[in-house]
């Protein structure tokens, strides 16, 4: 068993960097490991057009550590009113790489999201024409649907129809959490892929609920039962190029998580590749990590692979109990616990 693991530099195909003072912390954590990241647009107000995406991109670039080459890949937030012209303008910008479907009310800052899938068909047609991928938060939001069933229900009610109606549209089913989603992606045409988070590979709902409620495991889509966790691990280590890394690292200030009505999101960017390495090692599949983390994503998006490399070493270290987050602090995933892999910093 090797104690060193060298990979082409990975990318994160789903991250939340937030905005304002928090960028000074979140951008550095992401840039430490990743060459590029697909940056979620669910700000307040959301990133709805190329001009807003450019302004946000400039704020991210200004927060990069010195000498960093980290590249934010910007995303539009689809609304019921997103036009085909806005899609074409965004594609022509060269820095907007996708558009995101948030069903209204599905997750953090999704109130401006899409109320009916049919309302964005004009935008989806334009996206298919210009080659812009659709990123999907795949959950229905009707009150009568159990929170643990919302992903499967979304597949049956909406996603199959979108994939069939727009056969040339690239679709990324983001942060999949169920065996149903993994099976759907495997059986779908080649233009359908999926991201998987480290926390959905490492944890299930028992970790969040047994022995007391642990708010720092609370995320959306919510952690599912262990059989779904195993199905996600199967998909991640399979070598299937449809599955690739997307952390969904989503920081919230401590007081917003440790509350009577806490926010959804796990902060993993500070040690993302180390956490994925632990998950892959559980399956004796470290040889499949580079494909999942560094190759499948850029290949799906039609972007060049990174050419530089990172090295992980088998070395135990203690995750910090908290990290700075703008004017507050954030409790990261695995806070205070021991991690088994460590990223070698440049020059180490």
From Swiss-Prot:
It catalyses: (S)-dihydroorotate + H2O = N-carbamoyl-L-aspartate + H(+). It holds the Pfam family Amidohydro_1. GO terms for molecular function: dihydroorotase activity; zinc ion binding. Pathway: Pyrimidine metabolism; UMP biosynthesis via de novo pathway; (S)-dihydroorotate from bicarbonate: step 3/3. GO terms for biological process: 'de novo' pyrimidine nucleobase biosynthetic process; 'de novo' UMP biosynthetic process. Substrate binds at residues 16-18, 42, 137, 220, 252, 264. Keywords: Hydrolase, Metal-binding, Pyrimidine biosynthesis, Zinc. Its EC number is 3.5.2.3. Zn(2+) 2 binds at residues 100, 137, 175. InterPro entries: Amidohydro-rel, DHOdimr, Dihydroorotase_CS, Metal_Hydrolase. GO terms for cellular component: cytosol. It is an enzyme of class 3 (hydrolase). The keyword Hydrolase applies. Catalyzes the reversible cyclization of carbamoyl aspartate to dihydroorotate. This is Dihydroorotase. It comes from Pseudomonas aeruginosa (strain LESB58).
């Amino acid at each position: 068993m090797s104690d060193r693991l060298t990979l082409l530099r990975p990318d994160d195909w789903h991250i939340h960097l937030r905005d304002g003072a928090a960028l000074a912390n979140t951008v550095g954590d992401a840039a430490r490991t990743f060459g590029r990241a697909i940056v979620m647009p669910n700000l307040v107000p959301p990133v709805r057009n190329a001009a807003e995406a450019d302004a946000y991109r400039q704020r991210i670039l200004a927060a990069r550590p010195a000498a960093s080459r980290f590249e934010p890949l910007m995303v539009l937030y689809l609304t019921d009113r997103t036009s085909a012209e806005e899609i074409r303008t965004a594609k022509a910008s060269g820095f907007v790489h996708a558009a995101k479907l948030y069903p209204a009310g599905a997750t953090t800052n999704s109130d401006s999201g899409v109320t009916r899938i049919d309302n964005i068909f004009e935008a989806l047609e334009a996206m298919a024409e210009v080659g812009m991928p659709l990123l999907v938060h795949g959950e229905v939001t009707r009150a009568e649907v159990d929170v643990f069933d919302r992903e499967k229900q979304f597949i049956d009610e909406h996603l199959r129809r979108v994939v069939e109606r727009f056969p040339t549209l690239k679709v990324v089913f983001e942060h999949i959490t169920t065996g149903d989603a993994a099976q759907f992606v495997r059986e779908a045409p080649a233009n359908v892929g999926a991201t998987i988070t480290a926390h959905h590979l490492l944890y299930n709902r028992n970790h969040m609920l047994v022995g007391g409620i642990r708010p720092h495991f609370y995320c959306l889509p919510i952690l599912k039962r262990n059989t779904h966790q195993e199905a996600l691990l199967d998909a991640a280590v399979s070598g299937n190029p449809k599955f690739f890394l997307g952390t969904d690292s989503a920081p919230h200030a401590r007081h917003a998580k440790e509350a009577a009505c806490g926010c959804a999101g796990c902060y993993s960017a500070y040690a993302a590749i180390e956490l994925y390495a632990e998950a892959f090692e559980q399956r004796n599949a470290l040889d499949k990590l580079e494909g999942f983390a560094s190759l499948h994503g850029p290949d799906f998006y039609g972007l060049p692979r990174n050419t530089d490399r990172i090295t992980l070493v088998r070395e135990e270290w203690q995750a910090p109990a908290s990290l700075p987050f703008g004017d507050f602090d954030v409790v990261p995933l695995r806070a205070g616990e021991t991690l088994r892999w460590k990223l070698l910093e440049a020059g180490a």
